[in-house]
């Protein structure tokens, strides 16, 4: 198992009764997590002094309850900066557990010692996009949500990557890939959430399966 243990601005403080107590930078959030099936005493003071609490509804979905939390704030991971804001389905705009993948991608790209072209599909707010761009890759970032692509651009700007070779595409990922195939465009690596696929079997030096 890979563990994302290089965070300084994120940590799981405690978890009990189907919920996680998390620190995101200077703020503490409580969010539901179905994998937390144990019932242990909630001794951490953050359980009583959180900045926001997402309450799951028995009918599906849920809603946030806020206690002194700004509309938006930022956290850092290495040289990267991410803008966070709570929205639907308990999300904050970042999956911190993916950092272990960002590090792996970055190491592979740097060790290639040549130009690397990456396609990031379902790219969300750009965590993987920024990581591989910072490592020196040229990136095509594709997501069907215009709002998410705009958010990813904001993260790029916050990370000092506004001028990095990133193509921002708002499109259906499957349709975009179909058009890229017809155009004859090739990539050294394709990222889909936490999955990695090799587009060129003759280039195992760039990224291979872990």
Predicted segments with their positions:
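Non-catalytic substrate-recognition/targeting regions of SAM-dependent transferases
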Residues: 7-22, 29-96, 103
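Conserved alpha-helix/loop element of class I SAM-dependent methyltransferases that forms part
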Residues: 96-112
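Conserved class I S-adenosyl-L-methionine
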Residues: 115-121
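Conserved SAM-binding loop of SAM-dependent methyltransferases across substrates and taxa
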Residues: 125-137
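Conserved SAM-binding motif I beta-strand of class I
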Residues: 138-143
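Mobile active-site "lid"/loop adjacent to the S-adenosyl-L-methionine
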Residues: 146-148, 170, 187-199
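S-adenosyl-L-methionine
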Residues: 150-188
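Single conserved hydrophobic/aromatic residue that forms the stacking wall/gate
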Residues: 196-210
């Amino acid at each position: 198992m890979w563990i994302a243990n290089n965070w300084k601005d994120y940590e799981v403080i405690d978890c009990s009764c189907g919920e996680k107590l998390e620190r995101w930078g200077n703020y503490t959030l409580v969010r539901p997590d179905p994998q937390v099936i144990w019932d242990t005493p909630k001794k951490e003071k953050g359980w009583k002094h959180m900045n926001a609490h997402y309450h799951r509804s028995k009918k599906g979905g849920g809603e946030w309850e806020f206690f002194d939390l700004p509309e938006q704030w930022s956290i850092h991971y290495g040289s990267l900066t991410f803008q966070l804001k709570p929205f639907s389905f308990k999300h904050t705009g970042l999956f911190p557990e993916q950092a272990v993948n960002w590090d792996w991608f970055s190491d592979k790209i740097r060790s290639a010692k040549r130009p690397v072209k990456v396609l990031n599909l379902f790219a969300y707010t750009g965590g993987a996009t920024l990581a591989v761009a910072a490592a020196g890759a040229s990136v095509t970032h594709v997501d069907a949500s215009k709002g998410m692509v705009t958010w990813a651009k904001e993260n790029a700007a916050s990370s000092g990557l506004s001028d990095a070779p990133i193509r921002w595409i708002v499109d259906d990922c499957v349709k975009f890939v179909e058009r890229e195939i017809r155009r004859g465009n090739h990539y050294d690596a394709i990222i889909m959430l936490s999955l990695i696929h090799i587009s060129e079997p003759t280039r195992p030096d760039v990224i291979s399966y872990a």
